[in-house]
Structure formats: C-alpha cells, structure tokens
C-alpha cells in the first residue's frame, strides 16, 4: 500500500474579538475559509473533496451548526464530519484532516475550527458537561462531598490555579515570571492582524496591578473569550509540490489522554495528584517526535506554538514537550530565549493567552507554525524555520494533541 505524506498548502483566519456582532456564525467561519482558499491561489471550492470541522456547540447553544452553514464552508454536497474534544477540538480536527488524506480516502481536505462564544455562555456549557459526569460519581463510589474542595469547582481557572501553584513550587517561579510571559504574548499579539488582545505597551507592573481571580492568577494573566475561526487546507505531497510555493509537511501527529487530574486530587481517584506532571503531554510528544524522526527536540525544533490560556501553562508545556529542561523556563523567558529574536521562539502569534476562540485555538497553534515555516506569519521570526511544533490541550488538564511540521517530508512510516 502506498504511503501518503499529507501536507498543508494554506491557512486562513478571521479577525478575532470578544464579540463579532457584525457577522453571524456562518459568516464568521466563511471569513477564515475564504482567507485560506484565496491564499491557495489556484485552488477553488470545487477542488475540495471533504470538509472536517469542529467547535463546542454547547458553548454557543447552537446544535450542529455545520449543517446550516454548508454553503459558507465549501461543504455543499460533500462529505462533512464534525469533531468535538473540548479545548483540544482544533487539534483533533487538524489530526482528523491529516488522516483523511493519509488514508488515501481524499486528495484535498479542508479543516475548519471555530467558536462564537458571544452567542451563548461558555461557563454554562462547561457546567453542563461537568454536571453530567458528576451525577454518576456516587454510583462509582466517589465521595461527592469532597468534590466541593476540588480544583474543578473553579472551572478552567480553578484547574489552572492549582497547576500554577504546583509549577511555582517545583521551579521557584514567581508571579513576576508569570507576568513576564503575559507581556511577551500580548506584545506579540499586537503584531499579528487576526488576534484579540493587542497590547504593545503592556508591562509586568501593569499585569501585577490587576486583582486576583484565583491565586496566583490575576485578572491580567487570563485569556479572553474570543469569537473567531481558522481554516487549514490539506493535500498529498505530490499535489502540494504542484500547487504551493512552500508546502509544509505534517511529519508527526499524536493525541494522548490520561485520567483527569481533578479526580486524583480529591475524589478518591487514581489520577495524578500533581497537575503539572502532564505525563500525557510527555507521551504525546514522544509519539509525534518518533514519527517525525526527531531525537533531540530542543535542538531540532526551530519554533513552537503551545496551548497556554494561562502563563504558567506556557512555562510548563514547553518543558513537558521536551523543548526545555524541567523547571528551567522562568530563566529562559527572563533571558529572552523564547522571544521572537531568541534561540527558540515560542507563541509569536500571541498564543491562547491573547486569543481564545476555544474550538479554534488548538488548530491555530499548528496553523501559525505552518505560516512561520512558509515565512508568511503576521509576526514572522527573523530566522528560517525548518521544523515547528503545534500543541493543543483540553479536557480536565488531560487531553493533548501534538503536531510536528516541517519544510521537508520526513514522516517515519512503521
């Protein structure tokens, strides 16, 4: 059987904001799709064989929106698949599109990920998922009373604050170190046309002057709720070389989940008690790097986009994905190693900390890495990027996606 190497030939975005009241959901997504296909030059809507899309319908309160926006997403009379995996939705959509091409089933696949959070209430959507799981806890023998003390009670920031405290304990990081990550992200976002929070003059003191939401995380440290969409166009290696000036090859993909840490902390589960361990992220990186033939990621990866709604997570993820030694990141950020001009630039798009359309966020990470390799990013790094990483996170700090991209096909088929 022929081994097919998928490649990305174009990525598109729409403008992100807290409320895109100028468009409805279909029009919002269309902007990203049109941007993607227009940038692909010779490609037309009719050339697309299949569309794979994803969002979190409960967050908008609109069930199966892809069925009434087919005319806006090049999906009319074509196979259409929806993928939903929480915060990792975009990464899962990306990987699904990769396999749709790698399997030989389709030659050209359009991947779309989006969220229009202003249409609904994300917290209510999250609660509906959580309550469904909590309702069966007594039947499984869990002590439901102890859940009140659990980090899950604070939703996303409740989880992240526990992570932050554990990471600070491990690494001796300070609140100033967390604020430094935020400043770098928001200043990067100011140089990228589609991002949400653009703050070119933000300082560490500005961040530290904001009130606590959940210690040690302050209001100025948390991600926004964004409306936005992203689209990525996949095809085969052969077609990519014919169409694109600089095709970007998907050399490694992985998705790994382990038991939610919120169970292990205080509900009598067997999960991890330290939410910064992230063994799922370590394993996910190991699988994807193995597929891509990468033995020393800290030396072979030129650029990375990691999923970090909160600054402590950015410090944590780049360590767990093998780009830096454990507990070394606060010093690396202080020394400018992860800056745009640094040795290993991280999140030059501004990251999830600056723009968070939840369904799209995990696909925007590899999409931005693709653009860095192509030399077409909004906040392009000065060095040449040959190999890059796109990382996603979702679930109860337990579901990870890991995507390795490069300017040469190096997929290790087994």
Regions found by a protein language model. Give the residues of each.
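Active-site rim segments in enzyme catalytic domains, especially the processed small/beta chain
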Residues: 358
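Alpha-to-beta junction loops
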Residues: 106-107
């Amino acid at each position: 059987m022929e081994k097919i190497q998928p490649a990305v030939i174009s990525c598109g975005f729409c403008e992100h904001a807290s409320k895109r009241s100028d468009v409805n959901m279909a029009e919002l997504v269309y902007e990203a799709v049109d941007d993607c296909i227009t940038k692909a030059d010779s490609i037309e809507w009719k050339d697309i064989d299949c569309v794979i899309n994803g969002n979190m319908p409960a967050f908008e309160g609109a069930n199966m929106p892809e069925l009434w926006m087919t005319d806006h997403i090049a999906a009319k009379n074509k196979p259409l698949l929806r993928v939903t995996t929480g915060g990792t939705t975009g990464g899962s959509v990306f990987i699904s599109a990769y396999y749709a091409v790698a399997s030989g089933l389709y030659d050209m696949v359009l991947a779309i990920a989006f969220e229009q959070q202003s249409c609904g209430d994300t917290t209510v959507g999250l609660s509906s998922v959580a309550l469904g799981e909590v309702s069966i806890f007594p039947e499984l023998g869990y002590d439901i009373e102890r859940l009140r003390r659990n980090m899950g009670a604070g939703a996303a920031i409740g989880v992240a604050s526990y992570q932050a405290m554990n990471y600070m304990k491990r690494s001796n990081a300070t609140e100033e170190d967390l604020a430094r990550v935020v400043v770098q992200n928001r200043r990067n976002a100011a140089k990228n046309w589609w991002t949400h929070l653009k703050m070119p003059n933000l300082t560490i003191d500005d961040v530290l002057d904001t009130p606590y939401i959940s210690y040690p995380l302050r209001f100025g440290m948390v991600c926004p709720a964004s409306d936005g969409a992203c689209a990525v166009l996949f095809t085969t290696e052969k077609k990519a070389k014919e169409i694109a000036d600089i095709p970007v090859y998907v050399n490694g993909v992985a998705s790994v989940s382990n038991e939610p840490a919120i169970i292990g902390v205080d509900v009598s589960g067997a999960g991890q008690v330290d939410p910064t361990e992230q063994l799922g992220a370590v394993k996910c990186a190991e699988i994807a790097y193995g597929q891509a033939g990468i033995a020393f990621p800290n030396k072979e990866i030129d650029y990375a986009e990691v999923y970090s709604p909160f600054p402590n997570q950015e410090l944590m993820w780049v360590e767990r994905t093998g780009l830096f030694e454990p507990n070394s990141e606060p010093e690396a950020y202080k020394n400018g190693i992860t800056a745009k001009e640094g040795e290993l630039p991280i999140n030059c798009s501004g990251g999830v900390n600056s723009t968070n359309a939840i369904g799209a966020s995990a696909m925007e990470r590899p999409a931005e890495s693709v653009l860095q390799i192509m030399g077409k990013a909004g906040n392009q790094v000065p060095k040449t990027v040959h190999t890059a990483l796109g990382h996603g996170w979702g679930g109860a700090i337990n579901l990870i996606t890991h995507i390795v991209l490069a300017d040469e096909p190096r997929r290790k088929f087994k």
